[in-house]
């Protein structure tokens, strides 16, 4: 045991002596010390929920324990294992492509995200089958594989599962997982540092490229150009490409047509929110993994209240378990309702404002907020502005003059014209229907 570990053992013993057993087990039992130098200490908690709770409620308590044990006041920071994972990914240096997948991926793939831990339901069955087929026969089954769906529904889990499977079954396979935002940032840095050849070598000399959240490249013309050539080289060399997005290729605005076409070469599959049976199965599996003793009626309550995505569902279970230990009460439906009252209250439909609409439409069509009020009439701004006016009439109770006022003081007749134009276009334009469906989802989520 290292010196700092010994100090932390003493601090924990001090804390344990002063806390109720249930509180200690809930908040401190799984913590570790990561850094202790220059009057600073970094403590690692197993989850973001616990790290935030410690940072908010126990910093002074921890400070007192350190003072008693080492006689020194320290600057204390609490992080989670997830924080460290993200930081490692950001800081990981560019490595030579000759490395094996086992060397490439320790900080890129979540070890929990495998096919074995994925809960299959009606909303993801096809995507799971396609992902497994790709993992078993890279570049032979479906290339590219394009998985789309909302936040927290399992897209990234499936991509990580593909990566793990290939690493396990294909010796020395080169696998890279990256978000499209990080791809763009690395590309920009490679230009700045005059290292574009290194960048290209890193992403074009792999057996499997897993790229997450491709919709982030919308409007990023230079990065789209670079990814276009990366895609072509990998595809021509029979290397597997797996892409995820929050929407289908044809619904990503300002995506170059040549990229859109290539994304449609292989298989496009979607994941949808889990049904009740799947949500219960997810909770049951998670409770078994975490050794959480939860009765069926309490599990059913969580599953009926948290319907949006898997991430929130699992987070709710963790919160309920921690709350039960903290208050030292049996885990039942009443306690679940008490523990989740804030989450359930915030999950109810919110009142939509015109600014909410402008922000969502602006993000979708890459338009700045101030452009909705500007006098500009270019098509790239005028059309999104009309969309926003249409949605303002459909989703809010504001009067026509009030809507016009929020769009730079425009006359109410302009709002009527915009509403009628979009309404008529929706009758024949399926693509526009899908775009509005995605925007409305963003507004109300």
From Swiss-Prot:
Q: Where is this region: Domain III, AAA+ region?
A: 108-324
Q: What is its main location?
A: cytoplasm
| Domain comment as written in the entry | Domain I is involved in oligomerization and binding regulators, domain II is flexibile and of varying length in different bacteria, domain III forms the AAA+ region, while domain IV binds dsDNA.
Q: What residue spans carry the region label Domain II?
A: 72-107
CDD domains, per the entry:
AAA, Bac_DnaA_C
InterPro entries according to UniProt: AAA+_ATPase (IPR003593), Chromosome_initiator_DnaA (IPR001957), Chromosome_initiator_DnaA-like (IPR020591), Chromosome_initiator_DnaA_CS (IPR018312), DnaA_C (IPR013159), DnaA_dom (IPR013317), DnaA_N_dom (IPR024633), DnaA_N_sf (IPR038454)
- Asked whether the UniProt record includes Cytoplasm among its keywords, one would answer yes
A Pfam family assignment: Bac_DnaA_C
Q: Which family does it belong to?
A: Belongs to the DnaA family.
| Single GO BP term | DNA replication initiation
Gene Ontology molecular function: any one: lipid binding
Q: Summarize the protein's role.
A: Plays an essential role in the initiation and regulation of chromosomal replication. ATP-DnaA binds to the origin of replication (oriC) to initiate formation of the DNA replication initiation complex once per cell cycle. Binds the DnaA box (a 9 base pair repeat at the origin) and separates the double-stranded (ds)DNA. Forms a right-handed helical filament on oriC DNA; dsDNA binds to the exterior of the filament while single-stranded (ss)DNA is stabiized in the filament's interior.
Q: How does it assemble?
A: Oligomerizes as a right-handed, spiral filament on DNA at oriC.
Per the record, its GO cellular-component terms are: cytoplasm; plasma membrane
Recorded protein name is Chromosomal replication initiator protein DnaA
Give binding positions for ATP. Answer: 152, 154-156
Which PROSITE patterns does the record match to this protein?
DNAA (PS01008)
Q: Where is this region: Domain IV, binds dsDNA?
A: 325-445
Q: Where in the cell is it found?
A: Cytoplasm
Q: Which UniProt keywords apply?
A: ATP-binding, Cytoplasm, DNA replication, DNA-binding, Lipid-binding, Nucleotide-binding
- Region (Domain I, interacts with DnaA modulators) spans which residues? 1-72
């Amino acid at each position: 045991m290292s010196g700092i570990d010994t100090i932390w053992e003493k601090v924990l013993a001090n804390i344990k002596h002063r806390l109720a057993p249930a509180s200690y087990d809930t908040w401190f039992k799984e913590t570790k010390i990561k850094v202790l130098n220059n009057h600073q200490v970094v403590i690692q908690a197993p989850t973001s929920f616990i790290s935030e709770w410690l940072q908010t409620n126990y910093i002074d308590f921890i400070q007192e324990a350190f003072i008693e044990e080492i006689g020194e006041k320290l600057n204390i920071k609490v992080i989670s294992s997830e924080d460290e994972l993200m930081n490692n990914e950001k800081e990981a240096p560019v490595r030579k492509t000759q490395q094996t997948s086992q060397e490439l991926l320790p900080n890129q793939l979540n070890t929990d995200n495998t096919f074995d831990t994925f809960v299959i339901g009606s909303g993801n069955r096809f995507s799971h089958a396609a992902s497994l087929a790709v993992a078993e026969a890279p570049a032979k089954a479906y290339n590219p594989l394009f998985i789309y769906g909302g936040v927290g529904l399992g897209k990234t889990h499936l991509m990580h599962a593909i990566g793990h499977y290939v690493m396990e079954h294909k010796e020395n396979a080169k696998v890279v997982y990256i978000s499209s935002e990080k791809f763009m940032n690395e590309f920009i840095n490679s230009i700045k540092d005059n290292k574009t050849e290194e960048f290209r070598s890193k992403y074009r000399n792999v057996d499997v490229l897993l790229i997450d959240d491709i919709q982030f490249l919308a409007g990023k013309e230079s990065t789209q150009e670079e990814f276009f050539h990366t895609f072509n080289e990998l595809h021509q060399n029979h290397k597997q490409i797996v892409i995820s997005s929050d929407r289908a290729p044809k619904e990503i605005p300002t995506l170059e047509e040549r990229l859109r076409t290539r994304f449609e070469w292989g298989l496009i599959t979607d994941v949808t929110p889990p049904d009740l049976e799947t949500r219960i199965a997810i909770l049951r599996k998670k409770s078994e993994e975490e050794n959480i003793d939860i009765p069926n009626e309490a599990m059913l309550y969580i599953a009926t209240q948290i319907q949006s995505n898997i991430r929130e569902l699992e987070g709710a279970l963790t919160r309920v378990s921690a709350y039960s230990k903290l208050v030292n009460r049996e885990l039942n439906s009443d306690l679940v309702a008490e523990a989740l009252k804030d989450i359930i209250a915030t999950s109810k439909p919110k009142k939509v404002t015109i600014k909410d609409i402008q922000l969502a439409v602006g993000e979708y069509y890459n338009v700045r907020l101030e452009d909705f009020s500007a006098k500009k009439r270019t098509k790239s701004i005028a059309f999104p502005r009309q969309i926003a006016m249409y949605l303002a009439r459909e989703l809010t109770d504001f009067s026509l003059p009030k809507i016009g006022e929020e769009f730079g003081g425009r006359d109410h007749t302009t709002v009527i014209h915009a509403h009628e134009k979009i309404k008529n276009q929706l009758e024949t334009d399926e693509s526009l229907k899908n775009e509005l469906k995605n925007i409305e989802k963003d507004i109300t989520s």
